[in-house]
Amino acid sequence: MKIELASSYGFCFGVKRAIKIAENAGDAATIGPLIHNNEEISRLEKNYNVKTLEGIDELKDEKKAIIRTHGITKNDLAELKKTDIKVIDATCPFVTKPQQICEKMSEEGYDVVIFGDMHHPEVKGVKSYAKGNVYVVLEESELEGIKFKQKVALVSQTTRKVEKFMQIANYLMLHVKELRVFNTICNATFENQEAAKNLAKRADVMIIIGGKNSSNTKQLYLISKNFCEDSYLIESEEELERSWFDGKNLCGISAGASTPDWIIQKVVDRIKKV
């Protein structure tokens, strides 16, 4: 059986940057998981004493606090800056962008629509920067019945599917007088999704590696599943099952933006032994 990696996969710029920031900081606490990958979070805690807290209220004797890649709410950031703790910002610059857009557009009188998961930390942070009406949706149907102002601004969670974002934009174009569309989907997300789709079209089995709480990894899995029925989402090589590969000729592999190369290599090595 041949094993082929997608042409684009794994660690993105924002995650690489955040990992380096955390390693350089050492002896610190992150506000929420730095990234959505439990294996890498454990490595940072073990090797660099970077622990994970659920929120700013858990800070006690820490000297340094690292803001996660997904960002935190505007209010939490303001509260954090009132303390004597050194604040180290590892928010991905691609996440900072929709935060700034929401703040600016709401100040200019626009209603703001965020395409994304309202429970995701990135979306919670982005939403907190809007000062007026703000709506978080995943489906066009959720927009029905909303009485918008004349002006609406649309942004996206950075890890969503472009096609779905365009559907939301098209709906709004038909229902509001003025629409500002800001494509805030990360380029790395788009490239990884396209690469996974192209590989899944040819593969007999697809393995998607990443945190099961990771939005971009889930999107990769769903895209892969559309084109390759035998697609599986795993966090480590321990989840692989021999039966998945029976009678298969091509095994495709992709990985989420928070998945380090060392985990990917472990999966590849295990599959080679099947």
From Swiss-Prot:
Binding site for dimethylallyl diphosphate: 36, 70, 120, 214-216, 258
Cofactor(s) needed by this chain: [4Fe-4S] cluster
CDD domains: lytB_ispH
Cofactor: binding details: Binds 1 [4Fe-4S] cluster per subunit.
Molecular function (Gene Ontology), one example: 4-hydroxy-3-methylbut-2-enyl diphosphate reductase activity
EC top class named in words: oxidoreductase
Annotated binding of (2E)-4-hydroxy-3-methylbut-2-enyl diphosphate, by residue: 36, 70, 120, 158, 214-216, 258
Keyword terms of this UniProt record: 4Fe-4S, Iron, Iron-sulfur, Isoprene biosynthesis, Metal-binding, Oxidoreductase
Pfam families according to UniProt: LYTB
Gene3D superfamilies recorded: 3.40.50.11270, 4-hydroxy-3-methylbut-2-enyl diphosphate reductase, catalytic domain
Binding site for [4Fe-4S] cluster: 12, 92, 186
Positions contributing to isopentenyl diphosphate binding: 36, 70, 120, 214-216, 258
Oxidoreductase found in the keyword field: yes
Gene Ontology annotations of biological process type: dimethylallyl diphosphate biosynthetic process; isopentenyl diphosphate biosynthetic process, methylerythritol 4-phosphate pathway; terpenoid biosynthetic process
Pathway membership, UniProt: Isoprenoid biosynthesis; dimethylallyl diphosphate biosynthesis; dimethylallyl diphosphate from (2E)-4-hydroxy-3-methylbutenyl diphosphate: step 1/1; Isoprenoid biosynthesis; isopentenyl diphosphate biosynthesis via DXP pathway; isopentenyl diphosphate from 1-deoxy-D-xylulose 5-phosphate: step 6/6
UniProt cross-references to PANTHER family, sorted A to Z: 4-HYDROXY-3-METHYLBUT-2-ENYL DIPHOSPHATE REDUCTASE (PTHR30426:SF0)
Descriptive protein name: 4-hydroxy-3-methylbut-2-enyl diphosphate reductase
Source species of the chain: Campylobacter concisus (strain 13826)
Name of the coding gene: ispH
